[in-house]
Curated annotation (Swiss-Prot):
ATP binds at residues 169-176. The keyword Cytoplasm does not apply. GO terms for molecular function: ADP binding; ATP binding; proton-transporting ATP synthase activity, rotational mechanism. The gene is atpA. This is ATP synthase subunit alpha. It catalyses: ATP + H2O + 4 H(+)(in) = ADP + phosphate + 5 H(+)(out). The lineage of its organism: Bacteria, Pseudomonadati, Pseudomonadota, Alphaproteobacteria, Sphingomonadales.
């Protein structure tokens, strides 16, 4: 075989001339120590705070502590396969997640990866998990109602689009049930084509049991609500960093709707567990502890999340993101650190009480302590007209109830007040998964506040309400339609409703 030097030199010259200069340069560090989901890494001198990094085995992490000689990284996965000396490389990207309508009907983890076995997600784009909340100028005041379908809420503690309304109570008081009923109640609005009426739903499960999350997904599917909902699940068995990140992930998905002129409601279930996960991470990163061993910035953890819920003005698309954060109290103690923090951040709170729940008053809302700081601005005109007096009557009832326990001989007016209060309390009860359209709520509360229940036995109130609404649907559908279409209780509609209720009173027995 003859060696042709000229040919070989030509090939070498061609190789040199066509050599690709686009070599990829990645900054690589090495693990100094690892344990409890935290890695200390040396050599990542230019890493950004909040940047994603990748370990040798493919597990991702996020740089949280930038110190003089090393970087504290929280690991989004198991640290079992990571050992001292392993390589860690920068990705150059801040944590981002897929967003868009392609996520509706799906269950994803804290990083937006699908965990429901329905294949990859068709996302419109990816957005950063940590962004600044909208400023003051792009916002407008809350003025459109979120119809929860729960009489006690829509009448007494109204929630508006763009509001932050805290749901707070002990374990097993029905906090999640309030949120799920709100989701189910959006079915009729989301079935239409009017994008301004639709309300997309996002449920973020933080530190919940997997069985609980599976049950919630099943309930949403059975009630036809999953098709317009997204579930973000960082369950109790997930690492603390994912439980910390999940609410921000869900919020980013909700912001896609808010910033594109659509409306969304997001439930964080619950932020107590997120704070616990963040406390765990902070202590392991050796940040100084404060009250109840939470780090000093635990208020900022929740405020920067909840400030992203907003109602945008018409120049910015008129979209909205409504937040319903949930906080679990211990033995009804709302003066603990995290509950007081979140109460001060939100625009009102819904108190759920164990003794009301056990007494059969469900939803177990303490009407006296619950408040909406947006108030009647978030109600339809019809609901505003009928619910004004119910608040006063229930307040008087609660005040009198305390005195009535001492004295037996009460005058007629006090007895009447106590009787009506007891009937109104019965009227506000509602079974789970049965949200009520607002026109039917209006008719119910109108009947309660205008004396139609005064002759009905307290035990028969629920039966009266069901029969009365069935009668209106069958014999007077035009009354309900008028309330639904005008969202008001005009004089003509009111006369027709009074006539219908008078006619029903004669046949109810």
């Amino acid at each position: 075989m003859e060696i042709r030097a000229a040919e070989i030199s030509k090939v070498i010259k061609d190789q040199i001339a066509n050599f690709g200069t686009d070599a990829t340069v990645t900054e690589i560090g090495s693990v100094l120590s690892v344990g409890d989901g935290i890695a200390r890494v040396h050599g990542l001198d230019n890493v950004q705070a909040g940047e994603m990094v990748e370990f040798a085995n493919g597990v991702k992490g996020m740089a949280l502590n930038l110190e003089a000689d090393n970087v504290g990284i929280v690991i989004f996965g198991s640290d079992a396969a990571i050992k001292e000396g392993d390589q860690v490389k920068r990705t150059g990207t801040i944590v981002d997640v897929p967003v868009g309508k392609g996520l509706l009907g799906r269950v994803v983890d804290g990083l937006g990866n699908p965990i429901d076995g329905k294949g990859p997600i068709k996302a419109d784009k990816r957005m950063r998990v940590e962004v600044k909340a909208p400023g003051i100028i792009p916002r407008t005041s809350v003025h459109e109602p979120v119809q929860t379908g729960l009489k006690a809420l829509d009448a007494l503690v109204p929630v508006g689009r763009g509001q932050r309304e805290l749901i707070i109570g002990d374990r097993q008081t029905g906090k999640t049930a309030v949120a799920i009923d709100t989701f189910i109640n959006q079915k009729a609005a989301n079935a239409g084509d009017d994008e301004s009426k639709k309300l997309y739903c996002i449920y973020v499960a933080v530190g919940q049991k997997r069985s609980t999350v599976a049950q919630i997904v099943r309930q949403l599917e059975e009630n036809g609500a999953m098709e317009y909902s997204i579930v973000v699940a960082a369950t109790a068995s997930e690492p603390a960093p994912l439980q910390f990140l999940a609410p921000y992930t869900g919020c980013t998905m909700g912001e896609f709707f808010r910033d594109n002129g659509m409306h969304a409601v997001i439930v964080y279930d619950d932020l107590s567990k997120q704070a616990v996960a963040y406390r765990q991470m902070s202590l392991l990163l050796r940040r100084p502890p404060g009250r109840e061993a939470y780090p000093g910035d635990v208020f900022y953890l929740h405020s920067r999340l909840l400030e992203r819920a907003a109602k945008m003005n018409s120049d910015n698309g008129s979209g909205s993101l409504t937040a319903l954060p949930i906080i679990e109290t211990q033995a009804g103690d709302v003066s603990a650190y995290i509950p007081t923090n979140v109460i001060s951040i939100t625009d009102g709170q819904i108190f759920l009480e164990t003794n009301l729940f056990n007494a059969g008053i469900r939803p177990a809302i303490n009407v006296g302590l619950s408040v909406s700081r947006v108030g009647s601005a978030a109600q339809t005109k019809a609901m505003k007209k009928v619910s004004g007096s119910i608040k006063l009557e229930l307040a008087q009832y609660r005040e009198m109830e305390a005195f009535a326990q001492f004295g037996s001989d009460l005058d007629a007016s006090t007895q009447k007040l106590l009787g009506r209060g007891a009937r109104l309390t019965q009227l506000l009860k509602q079974p789970q998964f049965q949200p009520m359209p607002f026109e039917e709520q209006t008719a119910s509360i109108f009947a309660g506040t205008n004396g139609y229940l005064d002759t009905v036995a307290t035990t028969d109130v629920s039966r009266y309400e069901a029969a009365m609404l069935a009668y209106l649907r069958s014999d007077h559908p035009q009354v309900l339609a008028a309330i639904r279409d005008s969202k008001d209780l005009g004089d003509d509609t009111k006369k027709a409703l009074v006539a219908a209720l008078d006619a029903f009173a004669k046949i109810f027995a």
